């Protein structure tokens, strides 16, 4: 008959189960076939290594652009190249002024869309110089779109940039840059998701004592197929 009765330990175990105090087995790790978390910071750390070939391309472009702008504007322009920045696209877009001329660009044969950004101060500075000014008088930027005349000059400037940038890339990789469309707001120029890693460079231009910036931005996924070339140097 004693086998029909529960021991004190068994009674205690049942009471814990009813009250919700029963010990639960500790997880032994995620199942091999279950979903795995992905740390976006991991990609960022991988990308952050130096890309010496891209640095040389940028330096070469800065030299070529100076000559190209002189031929286009018949004015001397000084320019300098900033360091390559690796960051999330949301961080890059957050630092852009509004309105800004955002130019979506195909870089064939690479897959994806690059972004060339002309700060409004650059556009107005070039327009002023094209019409005989010296860039000392600043046009109000906020609250208006670019005029038809300004858009034509932007296209001319973009042609110079495309020509000289392709020339700078040619010893490394033969790229052809093609205009897709322009936007004024970064919300409509999403070349990448907000959390996706992008690689960008800022070029500072100076006309007669006035400064303006131009930015070139690639999604990392776009240049990843040629990453070995960018690491190697030439």
Model regions and ranges:
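N-terminal auxiliary interaction/assembly segments of multi-subunit proteins
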Residues: 1-234
């Amino acid at each position: 008959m004693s086998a029909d009765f529960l021991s004190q330990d068994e009674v205690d175990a049942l009471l814990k189960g009813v009250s919700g105090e029963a010990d639960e087995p500790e997880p032994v790790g995620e199942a091999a076939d279950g979903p795995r978390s992905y740390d976006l910071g991991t990609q960022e750390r991988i990308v952050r290594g130096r890309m010496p070939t891209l640095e040389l391309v940028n330096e070469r472009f800065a030299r070529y652009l100076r000559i190209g702008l002189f031929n286009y504007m018949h004015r001397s322009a000084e320019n300098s190249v900033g360091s390559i920045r690796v960051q999330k696209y949301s961080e890059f877009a957050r630092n852009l002024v509004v309105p800004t001329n955002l130019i979506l660009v195909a870089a064939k044969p690479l897959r994806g869309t690059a972004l060339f950004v002309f700060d409004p101060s650059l556009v107005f500075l070039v327009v002023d110089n094209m019409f005989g000014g010296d860039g000392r008088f600043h046009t109000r930027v906020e609250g208006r779109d670019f005029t038809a005349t300004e858009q034509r000059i932007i296209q001319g400037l973009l042609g110079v940039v495309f020509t000289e940038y392709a020339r700078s890339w040619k010893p490394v990789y033969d790229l052809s840059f093609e205009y897709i469309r322009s936007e004024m707001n970064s919300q409509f120029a999403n070349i990448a998701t907000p959390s996706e890693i992008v690689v960008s460079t800022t070029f500072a231009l100076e006309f007669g004592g006035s400064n303006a910036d131009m930015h070139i931005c690639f999604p990392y996924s776009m240049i990843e197929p040629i990453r070995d070339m960018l690491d190697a140097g030439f």
